[in-house]
Amino acid sequence: MEGKVVNLSYEELEAILLTVVSSNPKKEELQNCYNVLKDFKKNINSVEQFLKQIKMNKNDKIRQLAAILLNRKIEKHWPNFNDQIKLEIKKLLLELIRNEKNYLVSKAVQFICLDFENGRVI
C-alpha cells in the first residue's frame, strides 16, 4: 500500500530533520519522522524544500541530511522539471558548493551534482 504524498513547510521539515539528527531521539518520534519523510520525498516540492534547508539552515547536520535525502530523490523528480527550473537548480547547487564552509555538507551537495547515465543535474 502506498503512503500519501505530503507537503511540509520549511519549519515543519526543519523540525523533522532536527529530530532525526538529534543525539537521542525517542524511537517512536524517529519512526514517525522517517514515515513522514518517506511520504514527503514523493512530492516534487520536496526538491525545493530540501534545497532551502541546504541553503538557509544554520545547523550543519540538518544541511547535510537534507543534501543526502535530496540526492536520493532528485533523479526521480528531475524529468518533471522544465529546462528553466533545471538550470536554476544547477546554479543553486554550484553556488552551495562554492559557498559551503562545512566539508561534509559540501561533499553531500557535490554528490547531488554527479552525472549519471540519464544526464542528471550537471
Language-model-detected regions and their locations in the chain:
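Alpha-helical solenoid scaffolds in large eukaryotic transport, assembly, and signaling factors
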Residues: 2-122
